[in-house]
Curated annotation (Swiss-Prot):
Known function: Then it catalyzes the NAD-dependent ring dehydrogenation of precorrin-2 to yield sirohydrochlorin. Finally, it catalyzes the ferrochelation of sirohydrochlorin to yield siroheme.
Keyword Metal-binding among UniProt keywords: no
Pfam families referenced in this protein's UniProt entry, alphabetically: CysG_dimeriser (PF10414), NAD_binding_7 (PF13241), Sirohm_synth_M (PF14824), TP_methylase (PF00590)
InterPro entries: 4pyrrol_Mease (IPR000878), 4pyrrol_Methylase_sf (IPR035996), 4pyrrole_Mease_sub1 (IPR014777), 4pyrrole_Mease_sub2 (IPR014776), CobA/CysG_C (IPR006366), NAD(P)-bd_dom_sf (IPR036291), Siro_Cobalamin_biosynth (IPR050161), Sirohaem_synt_dimer_dom_sf (IPR037115)
Name under which the protein is recorded: Siroheme synthase
A Gene Ontology BP annotation from the UniProt entry: cobalamin biosynthetic process
Highest classification ranks of the organism: Bacteria, Pseudomonadati, Pseudomonadota, Gammaproteobacteria, Enterobacterales
Pathways per UniProt: Cofactor biosynthesis; adenosylcobalamin biosynthesis; precorrin-2 from uroporphyrinogen III: step 1/1; Cofactor biosynthesis; adenosylcobalamin biosynthesis; sirohydrochlorin from precorrin-2: step 1/1; Porphyrin-containing compound metabolism; siroheme biosynthesis; precorrin-2 from uroporphyrinogen III: step 1/1; Porphyrin-containing compound metabolism; siroheme biosynthesis; siroheme from sirohydrochlorin: step 1/1
Keywords assigned by UniProt, alphabetized: Cobalamin biosynthesis, Lyase, Methyltransferase, Multifunctional enzyme, NAD, Oxidoreductase, Phosphoprotein, Porphyrin biosynthesis, S-adenosyl-L-methionine, Transferase
Region annotation (Uroporphyrinogen-III C-methyltransferase) ranges: 216-457
Family the UniProt entry places it in: In the N-terminal section; belongs to the precorrin-2 dehydrogenase / sirohydrochlorin ferrochelatase family. In the C-terminal section; belongs to the precorrin methyltransferase family.
Length: 457
């Protein structure tokens, strides 16, 4: 181990930065955040330093570096573009046994600055020992995606509960299980972020008083349209905390590869016109797993509340008293249109968007007259098998036969395929495509030739 990672208490302690430019400013922000009593020495300063000094946040010493500035310091940073000066600051600090960081010169420094993930009071520091700062930054970005934004507030709140938890739970095992539940409780994190004292109290009492081994929950997560990069940050966090993941055919393999490795996976394989597992059975799977005390993620393609039957599944849970939450996803209409170069709205062509199910059930006739109106974009989900009927009905109700249309297959995936034409060709075009596909109808489709970016990558 080349460096010992430590966390320094700098509040109200004297620290020195030599340098008055942009790099020095970045270092100053960190020391100010840590509560240091900061002095900055340079021949000239960028405006931010002057603003901080005017606000009484730090002291500026304009002029050449003088070693006496180090006399009361606990820590120093040399952040100038003058290598000789940086070396001089480092040597002066070394002679006084003061730790000194030298920017971009780790060999001349007695400590290095890590990449920091701040979820105060939780702090994570990542360092490559100065050999590869870019790698450290990339690792920090990865870790940022895994740590919920409100985790720091939950950690701080946990500190306030320690005494009560110790009284409530007799064994270390019970306390550990309680803390595990608390730190993954999404409702508590959101309540703390909103400073909702009533919800904080209710959730805390529920967590403390419920049986530790018999309380499960379900999180309904939208997986997005296909590309794993379009899964939301919160969605990623949920699938990596799950005990059980119940998922559909429309959830891509790339996204399933992100699921926690030891989570149970239950495939319910829903597809247009055919359900491998009946909806009622899916509802019962969610209920049964949650009643075992497990954290269940119901993972759905797109957004779970847009033609995903998410509401039906949650009603079952609600009736059984199972706690649940929802993480929205990028719906297929948004993802497929963006990756096909088709804006859903445009000032010149469409002032509204209609999202329509292509399951045209008997007795559930659509309002074709309104759908055939100009200045809007129609997006049909699961409409491939009904494309000829959609074409016929829209033309019968006045939509021009030359209206541009597009069908997007496997939208946002590397296997995405798009075919376009006119409304009079829709039924014929649909025969060339496979599910899952989305039908887009409107003048905005005409912009595809100009705005199509994804097929060029």
């Amino acid at each position: 181990m080349d460096h010992l990672p430590i966390f320094c208490q700098l509040r109200d302690r004297d620290c020195l930065i030599v340098g008055g430019g942009d790099v020095a400013e970045r270092k100053a922000r960190l020391l100010l955040d840590a509560g240091a009593r900061l002095t900055v020495n340079a021949l000239a300063f960028i405006p931010q330093f002057t603003a901080w000094a005017d606000a009484g946040m730090l002291t500026l010493v304009e002029g050449p570096f003088d070693e006496s500035l180090l006399d009361t310091c606990w820590l120093a940073i040399a952040a100038t573009d003058d290598d000789a000066l940086n070396q001089r600051v480092s040597e002066a600090a070394e002679s006084r046994r003061i730790f000194c960081n030298v920017v971009d010169a780790p060999k001349a420094a007695s400590f290095i600055m890590p990449s920091i993930i701040d979820r105060s009071p939780l702090m994570v520091a990542v360092s490559s020992g100065g050999t590869s700062p870019v790698l450290a930054r990339l690792l920090r970005e990865k870790l940022e995606s895994l740590l919920p934004l409100h985790l720091g507030q939950v950690a701080k709140y946990a500190g306030q509960l320690r005494g009560r938890v110790k009284q409530q739970f007799a064994t270390m095992g019970e306390r550990r299980r309680f803390w595990e539940k608390l730190f993954v409780n999404d409702r508590l994190a959101q309540s703390l972020a909103n400073n909702d004292q009533k919800a904080i109290t209710e959730t805390t009492e529920q967590l403390i008083n419920e049986p530790l081994d018999h309380r499960g929950e379900v999180v309904l997560v939208g997986a997005g349209p296909g590309d794993a990069g379009l899964l939301t940050l919160k969605g990623l966090q949920q699938i990596q905390q799950a005990d059980v993941v119940v998922y559909d055919r429309l959830v891509s393999d790339d996204i399933m590869n992100l699921v926690r490795r030891d989570a149970d996976r239950v495939f319910v394989g829903k597809r247009a016109g055919y359900h491998c597992v009946p909806q009622e059975e899916i509802n019962q799977i969610l209920l049964r797993e949650a009643q075992k005390g497990k954290r269940v993620v119901r993972l759905k393609g797109g957004d779970p509340f847009i033609f995903g039957r998410g509401g039906e599944e949650l009603e079952t849970l609600c009736n059984a008293g199972i706690p649940f939450s929802v993480v929205p996803g990028i719906t297929a209409a948004s993802g497929c249109s963006a990756y096909s170069g088709i804006p859903l709205t445009h000032r010149d062509y469409a002032q509204s968007v209609r999202l329509i199910t292509g399951h045209l059930k008997t007795g559930g006739e659509l309002d074709w007259e309104n759908l055939a109106a100009e200045k809007q974009t129609l997006v049909f989900y699961m409409g491939l098998n009904q494309a000829a009927t959609i074409q016929q009905k829209l033309i019968e109700h006045g939509m021009p036969g030359e209206m541009p249309v597009a069908i997007v297959e496997n939208g946002t995936a590397v296997t995405q395929r798009v075919i376009d034409g006119t409304l009079t060709q829709l039924g014929e075009l649909a025969q060339q495509m496979n599910s899952p596909s989305l039908i887009i109808i409107g003048r905005v489709v005409g912009l595809r030739d100009k705005l199509n970016w994804f097929s060029n990558h």
